[in-house]
Amino acid sequence: MMSCWFSCAPKNRQAADWNKYDDRLMRAAERGDVEKVSSILAKKGVNPGKLDVEGRSAFHVVASKGNLECLNAILIHGVDITTSDTAGRNALHLAAKYGHALCLQKLLQYNCPTEHVDLQGRTALHDAAMADCPSSIQLLCDHGASVNAKDVDGRTPLVLATQMCRPTICQLLIDRGADINSRDKQNRTALMLGCEYGCKDAVEVLIKNGADVTLLDALGHDSSYYARIGDNLDILTLLKTASENSNKGRELWKKGPSLQQRNLSQMLDEVNTKSNQREHQNIQDLEIENEDLKERLRKIQQEQRILLDKVNGLQLQLNEEVMVADDLESEKEKLKSLLAAKEKQHEESLRTIEALKSRFKYFESDHLGSGSHFRKEDMLLKQGQMYMTDSQCTSTGMPVHMQSRSMLRPLELALPNQASYSENEILKKELEAMRTFCDSAKQDRLKLQNELAHKVAECKALALECERVKEDSDEQIKQLEDALKDVQKRMYESEGKVKQMQTHFLALKEHLTSDAATGNHRLMEELKDQLKDMKVKYEGASAEVGKLRNQIKQNEMLVEEFKRDEGKLMEENKRLQKELSMCELEREKRGRKLTEMEGQLKDLSAKLALSIPAEKFENMKSLLSNELNEKAKKLIDVEREYERSLNETRPLKRELENLKAKLAQHVKPEEHEQLKSRLEQKSGELGKRITELTSKNQTLQKEIEKVCLDNKLLTQQVNNLTTEMKNHYVPLKVSEEMKKSHDVIVDDLNKKLSDVTHKYTEKKLEMEKLLMENASLSKNVSRLETVFIPPERHEKEMMALKSNITELKKQLSELNKKCGEDQEKIYSLMSENNDLKKTMSHQYVPVKTHEEIKTALSSTLDKTNRELVDVKKKCEDINQEFVKIKDENEILKRNLENTQNQVKAEYISLREHEEKMSGLRKSMKKVQDNSAEILAKYKKSQEEIVTLHEEIAAQKRELDTIQECIKLKYAPIISLEECERKFKATEKELKEQLSQQTQKYNTSEEEAKKCKQENDKLKKEILTLQKDLKDKNVHIENSYETERALSRKTEELNRQLKDLLQKYTEAKKEKEKLVEENAKQTSEILAAQTLLQKQHVPLEQVESLKKSLSGTIETLKEELKTKQRCYEKEQQTVTQLRQMLENQKNSSVPLAEHLQVKEAFEKEVGIIKASLREKEEESQNKTEEVSKLQSEIQNTKQALKKLETREVVDLSKYKATKSDLETQISDLNEKLANLNRKYEEVCEEVLHAKKKELSAKDEKELLHFSIEQEIKDQQERCDKSLTTITELQRRIQESAKQIEAKDNKITELLNDVERLKQALNGLSQLTYGSGSPSKRQSQLIDSLQQQVRSLQQQLADADRQHQEVIAIYRTHLLSAAQGHMDEDVQAALLQIIQMRQGLVC
């Protein structure tokens, strides 16, 4: 029975059954009651290490709760310290887990092993590290616990401490010699897990103690990757500082000159070899600018990495959701195991119910025998609470093939000598990587959808299983309730038997007392033995009753537990349904997200196809900025050279002026040639410089245009990035740290924009300067050329230069306009940046809320991890059980395979059968379709044949008619004359019918007139009667009734007359219609006759006329039939009216009788008038008449009083019968008392006889005989009492019948009273004439009504009392007859005795 309940516990702990003392010890341990624990331990067979249903013992409970005194008591008593629970934890594990250092110290004093491992492979030090208890860690380390012990996942206590964010414990473990760089099974270090879970303090401790930052895990990720996943910038900065301190090679790289600087220095040397010192300064400035640009590039790289980390975070979320789905599957499996356990519990409850039933049967069969004391077993077994926990969301990185080199590695400065081919290859690789990423995302989406569908199906199946289990539990509860009802019935029966035994015991006690008085010691001893036996039996019966009650209570507790389980199942079902709905919603959300991601990926791929990669763009940007800086420096150098040349040209100008003055006087050819050669050299040099400057100017213009295009592309990309950040990449609840990073990015962009705009303005200024220098140089050249050129040419050249100057001014104005437009664009970009800042401030969450959420999530993660550990341990235990079940399943599978082989050999599979059946059905359908088509074709052909036959027949008829027409083209006159004769005969018949109908209508009209005349006569008679009645005022009520009846009859007659008139008018209209139709027919006949006389008529017209006339004849016949019906109905109505008139005549009085009555009334009126005239003279006669009337009234009062006395007599009779019944009951009670007295006397006589007799055996026999006789007498008395009860019931029924008769009499009396009232009304009318009824009469009527009401109330009260008494008698007599002597029955008997005494009194 109990072995299946302990299936979850280890096999070694199931040796002993769970006892009541174990239960008490467990409760005392949970309460912390030391005295109770020590008292229970003092008893034999108590083991504090025994496991309960949940797989824990009192020893484990005390260690987990930290009750040091209880633990000390258990250790002193003696217990196996290494005993473990279902999770494989011993007392040391539990004390370390819950942070009870004193209990841990006590256990270590008793040499508890520190290297014991639970089912997860964790030691007590692991639990202490997770519990944040440094004192327990120190104790364990002092007692030789291994600091670097690893669990099943390969995690040390240091790893768990960093994962749980416990920096003090991390430091303590490191001080105790823990390995900082120890790795788990995924090659992750403590630093990686600390970065992942965002534990800044723990990470600082690890970095200070020399944790290696550069280590990689199995997926090739370092600790900075995990810090990016955790979204903690402080940890990132710590890692950067640590990596910078470790990597000193970067400083050398910073100090060494780059290739770009060397190229720039070579360019500067080629441009100008003279200014080496200034160029060195410019080179240093350029190096500084390059370093600034590098820093900016690093920031951009960090931003790109953050974006990539976000993408990776999204992928991790997807992976976590997959893990959650797996956890849901595991939860479902656990639910299935719970359901199986509950089914086992139900089976065991059924077994217990069957055992109870067998016990009850045994008690029923042998309720007098001594009951065996059953050992109490605790049937209430606790279910193991399976904590359904979500599995730990382990962070898995992004696959390596999804990350391109541009994403993973930092950006490098592109060399100017790199070819575009390598850039295109990089772009192609990135596109391929993005495509592979898209494909993998699609595959993941399909997998997720399939998994979700599978999980939804599993959830539905689980819901169905829950419903089935619920129905089973409901049925079992109903069975338990029925069993409880049976048990209660049997309890009541056993209590009755116990009460009988009590009465028997009291009787024996009285006998013993009487024997003690006489002095028979032997009888006393024997009777004492009998008493002892009876006591034993009584105690056994009471013990059995107590056991039954305990079992009933246990069953009730089981039923309550089943109900609780049902409630839990209902809640779990609801929860599963909610989870189902949530899963469906999540599936929809994921589908939407995947569609959005696919759209984003497509857009990104399109943009990537169009746009330049970030590395190339930034390299181009850096190159342009460097070249612009170099060109600015070159322009400065050119300006300086220009100033020098101006300084050199000034003395030359002076010399030229002097030469001009001299030339005006005289010119030497040698000097002229020298000057010419000098000027030509200078002009050649200046021309070279001009060409170089123009070429440089053109290249600068091209570069400026490229820069403008690049700026436009940048603005577009910035806008696209902002829109993407708003819509896709940035969630609504991101930490303030990300906000800071975005602010930094926005500031950098603003700086870049300001730098670009500043450089753009500088370049424009440089362009203007160059143009000005060009103009000045051209002017100088022209001047130098004009020295030896005539003035006309010089003027022309000056005009050309002026025109060039105007053109250049125009160009300058256009450039200024462009600058203004560029400034407006810059302002618009600044406003967009401000808007972006505002949106960032609105849409992002503060740090506090983020940290709070983070702490809450970390705490929930810790809890879930702990619960996961417990669940894993339980799962391993369950797996051990599943191995057995699998073995059994394999045996069953073998049997199944054998049966399947037999089935395959002997039978055909269902699929083949269904396929064959489907093939046959298809063939049948095809055959049916073919047959239907053939039938349809056959029907069509038959229809066509029928139509052809009909057409042939019609053609034959037409041929016959044509032949007849050919034979007889025209009809003969003889046939027409015959037709005329027939028509005339029909017309005569119709005219005769019309004349008969008119006669009938005339007769009906005459009868109606007679009826009207008779009604008028009756009305006149009624009016005369009314006048006579008004004059004489005799029998007013009768006259009114007759008037109403006559008026009703007159109204009915009037209605009938109206109906007859309507019918008469309708008949007239019909008559007119018939006359018109006859006229039409006669006109048609005349026209036909004229036509026949004039010319021969063809046969077709004759036949059409025949048809029309036959149709008219038929219609006329139908109309005649309808009119005959109407006439018959009218005749019926007339007969009814006649009958009504006859009835009125019979009911109404004839004139002669009416006149006689009238004369009699007139005579009476004359007599009354005479008496009234003689009132004054005959007042004495009137007083005598009044006295007579008063005497009559008194007689009526006396009659009423007699009626009342009759009613009182009836009531007295009722009371007398009631008293008779009560006396009879009292007599019966007295007889019962006499019988009891006789019984006592007989008992005394028997005792005297027993005294006389010597032998004890004879006395025993006599006792048995007397007891049997007493039982027989009591049975006879019970029979007599039952007979008396039946007689009483019969009398009660008779009394009820008498009451009904009395009710009938009362109704008759009430009718008599109403008649008397009418008589009094008549008397009052006679005495006082037509006046209102007197006050006395009304008072009498009211008094009579009140008396009648009071009598009715008295009767109702008497009936109620009588019924109450009968009910009381019935209940008490039945209880007394059945032998029940409860307190209620005793109280009822006391009531009966009191009532009897009252009746006797």
From Swiss-Prot:
<keyword id="KW-0832">Ubl conjugation</keyword>
<feature type="repeat" description="ANK 3">
    <location>
        <begin position="87"/>
        <end position="116"/>
    </location>
</feature>
<feature type="repeat" description="ANK 1">
    <location>
        <begin position="25"/>
        <end position="53"/>
    </location>
</feature>
<dbReference type="InterPro" id="IPR036770">
    <property type="entry name" value="Ankyrin_rpt-contain_sf"/>
</dbReference>
<dbReference type="GO" id="GO:0005829">
    <property type="term" value="C:cytosol"/>
</dbReference>
<feature type="repeat" description="ANK 4">
    <location>
        <begin position="120"/>
        <end position="149"/>
    </location>
</feature>
<feature type="repeat" description="ANK 6">
    <location>
        <begin position="186"/>
        <end position="215"/>
    </location>
</feature>
<feature type="coiled-coil region">
    <location>
        <begin position="273"/>
        <end position="361"/>
    </location>
</feature>
<dbReference type="GO" id="GO:0003779">
    <property type="term" value="F:actin binding"/>
</dbReference>
<dbReference type="Pfam" id="PF13637">
    <property type="entry name" value="Ank_4"/>
</dbReference>
<comment type="function">
    <text>Modulates isoactin dynamics to regulate the morphological alterations required for cell growth and motility. Interaction with ARF6 may modulate cell shape and motility after injury. May be involved in multiple neurite formation.</text>
</comment>
<comment type="function">
    <text>Regulates APAF1 expression and plays an important role in the regulation of stress-induced apoptosis. Promotes apoptosis by regulating three pathways, apoptosome up-regulation, LGALS3/galectin-3 down-regulation and NF-kappa-B inactivation. Regulates the redistribution of APAF1 into the nucleus after proapoptotic stress. Down-regulates the expression of LGALS3 by inhibiting NFKB1.</text>
</comment>
<keyword id="KW-0963">Cytoplasm</keyword>
<keyword id="KW-0539">Nucleus</keyword>
<dbReference type="GO" id="GO:0050728">
    <property type="term" value="P:negative regulation of inflammatory response"/>
</dbReference>
<keyword id="KW-0677">Repeat</keyword>
<feature type="modified residue" description="Phosphoserine">
    <location>
        <position position="265"/>
    </location>
</feature>
<feature type="coiled-coil region">
    <location>
        <begin position="423"/>
        <end position="827"/>
    </location>
</feature>
<dbReference type="GO" id="GO:0005634">
    <property type="term" value="C:nucleus"/>
</dbReference>
<dbReference type="InterPro" id="IPR002110">
    <property type="entry name" value="Ankyrin_rpt"/>
</dbReference>
<comment type="subunit">
    <text>Component of the apoptosome complex, composed of APAF1, pro-caspase-9 and UACA. In the complex, it probably interacts directly with APAF1. Interacts with LGALS3. Interacts with ARF6 and ACTB. Interacts with RAB39A.</text>
</comment>
<dbReference type="GO" id="GO:0008631">
    <property type="term" value="P:intrinsic apoptotic signaling pathway in response to oxidative stress"/>
</dbReference>
<dbReference type="InterPro" id="IPR042420">
    <property type="entry name" value="RAI14/UACA"/>
</dbReference>
<dbReference type="GO" id="GO:0008630">
    <property type="term" value="P:intrinsic apoptotic signaling pathway in response to DNA damage"/>
</dbReference>
<feature type="repeat" description="ANK 5">
    <location>
        <begin position="153"/>
        <end position="182"/>
    </location>
</feature>
<dbReference type="Pfam" id="PF12796">
    <property type="entry name" value="Ank_2"/>
</dbReference>
<keyword id="KW-0597">Phosphoprotein</keyword>
<dbReference type="Pfam" id="PF00023">
    <property type="entry name" value="Ank"/>
</dbReference>
<feature type="repeat" description="ANK 2">
    <location>
        <begin position="54"/>
        <end position="83"/>
    </location>
</feature>
<feature type="cross-link" description="Glycyl lysine isopeptide (Lys-Gly) (interchain with G-Cter in SUMO2)">
    <location>
        <position position="1020"/>
    </location>
</feature>
<protein>
    <recommendedName>
        <fullName>Uveal autoantigen with coiled-coil domains and ankyrin repeats protein</fullName>
    </recommendedName>
</protein>
<keyword id="KW-1017">Isopeptide bond</keyword>
<keyword id="KW-0040">ANK repeat</keyword>
<dbReference type="GO" id="GO:1901223">
    <property type="term" value="P:negative regulation of non-canonical NF-kappaB signal transduction"/>
</dbReference>
<keyword id="KW-0206">Cytoskeleton</keyword>
<keyword id="KW-0175">Coiled coil</keyword>
<dbReference type="GO" id="GO:0005856">
    <property type="term" value="C:cytoskeleton"/>
</dbReference>
<feature type="coiled-coil region">
    <location>
        <begin position="856"/>
        <end position="1368"/>
    </location>
</feature>
